[in-house]
């Protein structure tokens, strides 16, 4: 009872403090108190509810039966919208604060909200090596189920709360992407409800134009209601090698070399300064040396990026065996390194042992309680960006990131980009090795001004035929956006499928003016 009483006393004192100082002041200057006392317990309740629900639904096999009825309900909503005169654009009815994007779309308030309650794993077919899922299924659900039966996704993006729909309509990447590509490249079929209320299934051989146009389209070609995704046999552990590298030229050469080696199942780099990095390569295995086993996902363990940094500080190479699911979600507890700005003492051993089992807070709840003042502060003094550039431009790109924003650590993740139709493809006719450069944190460049600095970075990315992930703040104008992305197939399908009066253009959903 004593911990519960202590927590209750702390909560009471916090409420008195809020009454004295005002909620907005506390949310800005003592945000960690609010997060620890309220958001962490709420996040834990959310996680337990959705995990139990997903397990029960799948075990009782009710999801496929309910799925068809739910799809018919979506079709009915779309047809009713048409009968009422199609006066506004449509969008999903999922609240903007529930998405992993740091911003909330303004269009939710003005568009017709179509309710899409599709959050179940429908089928796992180990003979065809396919999992069929609904769009709101999360990566946490997928790993919990698939790893328990000995399977996994070839590309399993990091954070637990990322949804299949978001990873298809936006994009997704992981340290296995140098072998398999982006999340869209492991998908074999999409099922959608179109602007006229009709249902369509598309694959590389059936309705192929739509299949290739859907990724990155942000729900502007139709409503995704299911997807089929490749699965591969899983092993128990990842045998992970840590290699500190110094000197930018050496870092780029080593990272490029490891990314080209297909025997590496996983390749990842953490750049701690322009001249210091740790490059990690891993392979799946069923055997582990007990003395080198590291269950990094346990709540009391150090945050992964801090653990990796120790290899740099001590200038030594390392070898560890990490349980597969722990590896997949190695950055989840610290939200990469974003949590250190929210709970500055979050990696302290005492905090980890006492409260680490509640970490991390839900990104959706952090957004919901952000407030306008804090949102503006984040916009001007915080960067969250993923830029995808050709591997051959890595050294030039890192210099540009250093000069324009100066944020560290930087996440480095290689991926192969096939030459396929759609919004995103290489400049030539052959597949090309690209890299995701992820910058998350407070810029340390002098006189940082969000708009001008980000526009400068976006200009560089366009110049090397790179791409910007669309969850992030986009400062490009429409012309610049379509210079970055190939809209030929996308615009053709929008006209063919009657999307122009049903859905906004993708730029109008992701541009800076469309979000707050």
Swiss-Prot record:
Binding residue positions for FAD: 163-175
SUPFAM superfamilies tied to this protein: FAD-binding/transporter-associated domain-like (SSF56176)
GO cellular component, one term: membrane
InterPro entries with a match to the protein in the record: Diminuto-like, FAD-bd_PCMH, FAD-bd_PCMH-like_sf, FAD-bd_PCMH_sub2, Oxid_FAD_bind_N
Domain FAD-binding PCMH-type, first and last residues per copy: 58-234
Principal subcellular localization: endoplasmic reticulum
Known cofactor(s): FAD
Gene Ontology biological-process entries: amyloid precursor protein catabolic process; cholesterol biosynthetic process; cholesterol biosynthetic process via desmosterol; cholesterol biosynthetic process via lathosterol; male genitalia development; membrane organization; negative regulation of cell population proliferation; plasminogen activation
Annotated GO MF terms: Delta24(24-1) sterol reductase activity; Delta24-sterol reductase activity; enzyme binding; FAD binding; oxidoreductase activity, acting on the CH-CH group of donors, NAD or NADP as acceptor; peptide antigen binding
Signal peptide (UniProt feature, chain positions): 1-22
Tissue: Highly expressed in brain and adrenal gland with moderate expression in liver, lung, spleen, prostate and spinal cord. Low expression in heart, uterus and prostate. Undetectable in blood cells. In the brain, strongly expressed in cortical regions, substantia nigra, caudate nucleus, hippocampus, medulla oblongata and pons. In brains affected by Alzheimer disease, expression in the inferior temporal lobe is substantially lower than in the frontal cortex.
Substitution effect: residue 294 to T: In DESMOS; decreases production of cholesterol from desmosterol
Subcellular location: Endoplasmic reticulum membrane; Golgi apparatus membrane
Record-annotated site: Cleavage: 122-123, 383-384
Gene3D superfamilies linked: 3.30.465.10
Known disease link: Desmosterolosis: Rare autosomal recessive disorder characterized by multiple congenital anomalies and elevated levels of the cholesterol precursor desmosterol in plasma, tissue, and cultured cells.
Function: Catalyzes the reduction of the delta-24 double bond of sterol intermediates during cholesterol biosynthesis. In addition to its cholesterol-synthesizing activity, can protect cells from oxidative stress by reducing caspase 3 activity during apoptosis induced by oxidative stress. Also protects against amyloid-beta peptide-induced apoptosis.
Protein name: Delta(24)-sterol reductase
Native organism: Homo sapiens
Recorded name of the encoding gene: DHCR24
